[in-house]
């Protein structure tokens, strides 16, 4: 996740797929990378998603920073809340995407993130 070329990529869309409710909730990010290529990131086995998106602004949502962290306050608090009911908590990761255009952010607490190539789109 940290190895993607995030700075100046564009966050095109965020899709929350709950068709397999509670078993494998998925968050899908549609990204245009600085190279112009489009990519889809699938966050699988999502346990929580915190989205603070500012809408109504007529411009693309440029990514300022994106990173994986163990120290996010919301993530630490969430893990404390579910430690006794979540049997795979040690596999849980926190992914944060921050935008520069609107000051928005997305935090995804998930077990796994995979890239779906543009060939699959």
Q: What is the predicted role of each segment?
A:
Residues 1-121:
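Surface-exposed, interaction-prone regions used to assemble/regulate multi-protein complexes
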